[in-house]
Amino acid sequence: METFDFIHKKFGFGMMRLPMNGDVVDTDQVSKMVDYFIDNGFNYFDTAHGYINGLSEKAVKTCLSSRHDRSEYILTDKLTGSFFKKQEDIRPLFESQLEATGVDYFDFYLMHAQNAHEFVKFKECKAYETAFELKKEGKVKHVGISFHDRAEVLDQILTEYPEIEIVQIQFNYLDYNDLSVQSKLVYEVCEKHDKPVLVMEPVKGGNLVKLPTDAQPILDALNGDGSNASYAIRFAASFKNMRVVLSGMSTFEQMQDNVSFMKDFKPFTKEEYKAVEEVAEVFRSHKMIPCTSCHYCVEENHCPRNIRIPEMFANYNTKKTFGDWNADYYYNNVLVSGEHSKASECVKCGMCEKVCPQHLPIRELLVQVKEEFEK
């Protein structure tokens, strides 16, 4: 496939966590990152209509498509269920995405955040059929899905729609054997259906960058000076069916680090596989909340109490893992302020749980947060 062959390296720029100046994207910084990425031989970019409340697609136009020839890069966008109610809504949404990103076609167009519930809606609205029509018209080169559910659901989707060409999955060494995320089992379904794989969350929302103090020595003992991010990203990239591993880089320094070890990619060694499994065991012993900070739970008014759910979970993990004394102050004086409610003020509506890609029991977890910080 022409587009697949044009993917220069196994590393992509996920434009979900871009550097910000307040409420706006720092386009100067992003442009610098884009240029550095392309100058070092990389060419895969990923966005979605809802990322940063629509600012990600606009940043693609400002920082990428208006500054680089279309032949220099591969661009993936996604069809998200929350932005359409019926089939007739899909084409206008798609055209608005082309306009927002400043291109006249997408290399990959993914049915976004597919799970058992979303798949029903996408079928009812003939979203897959519409995407396949867009491909015939040349507005999309390849149709795929991004997926967050159990392996048997993916098997069902790929069986019903064998035309799907690529699958984006959450895959990292912490989730590899996780019973809820099922990274290993989901990957094996992709192999069964002979579908190449795109990787999201290789560092699990940053959780595999800042390790628990009792886990860090495990990676430090390895021969070499690799960063924590390097071990996480290289782990995912070492599986043979992985075409691109995405990283949601938010600083130029992160970009430099990631490029440094992915420019001349070296697969994982047996020693490294053993080390990251030991790190995963340490994480599991801390019983951390496995939130990736995607913010779906708080976007589009999904939380009527405006609780800062991802930040509270991250703060909880920080205190539990590192014993950070500052976590209590941060909870009471930063996370709970103005219009933002305490964890105890959750009204148990469950809207957050319906959109959580990790299928977390958010209402129960907020009780844990309350018990930790509202003593």
Residue ranges of model-derived segments:
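N-terminal binding-site loop/beta-alpha segment at the start of enzyme catalytic domains
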Residues: 1-73, 130, 136
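Conserved residues at the C-terminal ends of beta-strands
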Residues: 14, 48, 109-112, 146, ...
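Glycine/proline-rich, positively charged
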Residues: 21-22, 35, 84-203, 210-217, ...
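Structured C-terminal cap/extension of enzyme domains
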Residues: 27, 35-38, 42-43, 62, ...
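Short catalytic-loop micro-motif centered on adjacent basic/acidic residues
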Residues: 44-51, 141-145, 168, 244-246
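Hydrophobic residues in well-ordered beta-strands that form the structural core
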Residues: 46-47, 77, 199
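Structural motif corresponding to the early beta-alpha repeats
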Residues: 51, 67-88, 112
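Short, well-ordered alpha-helical microsegments
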Residues: 56-60, 150-155, 255
